[in-house]
Amino acid sequence: MSGGYVKIARGIFKHNMFKDEPFTEREVWIWLICGASYKDDTIRIPNTNIVTKIKRGEYMASYRFLATKFKWPISRVKRFIDRLKSGTMLSTRVVQGITFITIENYDEY
């Protein structure tokens, strides 16, 4: 099979049939795509009074949160994000210590 799309429910990562174990790199990539905002929106950064805009294809998280979610050391999260950035798969911006991850070409996914 060499193309096309598959529709995946965003809740797949919460299904109780799957073990709660460290994510593979591919699972992290799919998780980021599934978690990205599907529309432009205005959000409040958790535990702050900061309100900011989030764009379609962006995901907001700290590296610490991602490390906990993926069951990875923070250093591995940073290295993987850097690798995806160098491959132009995503970009990042930081607002008040919170990283906004932009999935490049989000509409293709």
Regions found by a protein language model. Give the residues of each.
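Short, amphipathic alpha-helical interaction segments positioned at domain boundaries
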Residues: 69, 107-109
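Generic structural "secondary-structure junction" signal
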Residues: 8-10, 14, 45-47, 105
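Winged helix-turn-helix DNA-binding recognition segment
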Residues: 18-19, 36-102
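Long, low-complexity, charged/polar intrinsically disordered regions in eukaryotic proteins
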Residues: 1-34
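Generic secondary-structure boundary/loop-capping signal
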Residues: 5, 9-10, 40, 56, ...
